[in-house]
From Swiss-Prot:
Positions annotated to bind NAD(+): I175, D195, R200, L261, G262, I263, I285, Y286
Protein name: L-threonine 3-dehydrogenase
Co-factor requirement: Zn(2+)
Pfam families the record matches: ADH_N, ADH_zinc_N
Function: Catalyzes the NAD(+)-dependent oxidation of L-threonine to 2-amino-3-ketobutyrate.
Gene of this entry: tdh
The protein's Enzyme Commission number: 1.1.1.103
Residues annotated as binding Zn(2+) 2: C93, C96, C99, C107
Organism the protein comes from: Xanthomonas oryzae pv. oryzae (strain KACC10331 / KXO85)
UniProt-annotated catalytic positions: T40 (charge relay system), H43 (charge relay system)
Lineage: Bacteria, Pseudomonadati, Pseudomonadota, Gammaproteobacteria, Lysobacterales
Oligomeric and partner information: Homotetramer.
Annotated catalysed reactions: L-threonine + NAD(+) = (2S)-2-amino-3-oxobutanoate + NADH + H(+)
Family: Belongs to the zinc-containing alcohol dehydrogenase family.
Gene Ontology biological process terms, A to Z: L-threonine catabolic process to glycine
Cofactor remark from the record: Binds 2 Zn(2+) ions per subunit.
């Protein structure tokens, strides 16, 4: 079968022929329909410092997908061949304190598909049946293909009560864009998104952000004054940029709450005085709550949330290089590749 493989220890990704995997007793073989390119895939493609520490060459990458059940393991029940599914990309151990305590999204033994084990940029893949998420008929496959990052956005946006609140989102990547839309959809007052990429800021505005701010041209404090704000009640840090995080700390209202998804460089500093004396809450976010986030984000789409607005490109798998080029240049929202 075809698969996108990180074959060499340098920039690039390679379309190769690899064996079709065989499902174990508790696994399902999935025939992929569509897969989306994630920022993690771009890191692996670029072979940055994180990738060099984490990825073993020969890995099939990818973790955002939708497909149909092709074969059931001998012990699997509750699914049918041909059923359309996505899946939680974090495979957890099931026996640690957090898994047994109902917090599997915090499992310290988590294995990520397309990072630690072979992933979804392939014609077929295997997944534990317990990780599957059935996709309702009303949701098109091109949207279901990126439920994984949509779930990251939903986890962040729903971590704190944003109804009637002023929300600052630093970083207008696809997750930040989607989070802006969710916050407005559920009743936030002002949602302000910052970045330095005008293309992606436009997507955030289209998704419903009250104001988008290119911080290389406009002062966030000036925007706050225009909106008659003393500070932000909730912050969603999506950029992984220490300067953006420190700007957020500076602009938070006393008692504000911050959800952090962006990964900061090792050793990055922050102004701890602002966290302490403003009484801020800072919550790390990793992945999606299993499976409460999946339920809520599915219902959001079914209730009219315009997830389609972040989808900018659909390409056949043979044009994967174009997709990675668009992502590297920052000239795309979500890019979905088709295996059909």
């Amino acid at each position: 079968m075809k698969a996108l493989v990180k074959r060499e220890t340098n920039k690039g990704i390679w379309l190769e022929q690899v064996p079709v995997p065989t499902p174990g007793p508790n696994e399902v073989l999935i025939k992929l329909e569509k897969t989306a390119i994630c920022g993690t895939d771009l890191h692996i493609y670029l072979w940055d410092e994180w990738s060099q520490r984490t990825i073993k060459p020969g890995l099939t990458i990818g973790h955002e997908f939708v497909g149909r059940v092709a074969e059931l393991g001998s012990a699997v029940t509750g699914y049918q061949v041909g059923q359309r599914v996505s899946a939680e990309g974090h495979i957890v151990c099931g026996h640690c304190r957090n898994c047994r305590g109902g917090r599997p999204h915090l499992c310290p033994n988590t294995m990520g598909i397309g990072v630690n084990v072979n992933g979804a940029f392939a014609e077929y893949m295997v997944m534990p049946a317990s990780n599957l998420w059935p996709i309702p008929d009303q949701i098109p496959s091109e949207l279901a293909a990126f439920f994984d990052p949509y779930g990251n956005a939903a986890h962040c946006a729903l971590e704190f009560d944003v109804i009637g609140e002023d929300v600052l989102i630093t970083g207008a990547g696809p997750i930040g864009i989607i989070a802006a839309g969710i916050c407005k959809h559920i009743g936030a007052r002002n949602v302000v998104v910052t970045d330095v990429n005008d293309f992606r800021l436009k997507l955030a505005a289209d998704m419903g952000a009250t104001r988008v701010v290119n911080v290389s041209k406009t002062s966030l404090k000036d925007v706050m004054a225009d909106l008659h704000m003393e500070g932000f009640d909730v912050g969603l840090e999506m950029s992984g940029n220490p300067r953006a995080f420190n700007d957020m700390l500076d602009c938070m209202y006393h008692g504000g709450k911050i959800a952090m998804l962006g990964i900061m460089p090792r050793g990055a500093g922050c102004d701890w005085d602002k966290i302490i004396f403003k009484g801020l809450t800072v919550q790390g976010i990793y992945g999606r709550k299993m499976y409460e986030t999946w339920y809520k984000m599915t219902q959001l789409v079914l209730s009219g949330f315009p997830l389609h607005k972040v989808l900018t490109h659909q390409l056949p798998i043979d044009d994967f290089q174009k997709g990675f080029d668009l992502m590297e240049a920052g000239k795309a929202g979500k890019v979905v590749l088709s295996w059909n």
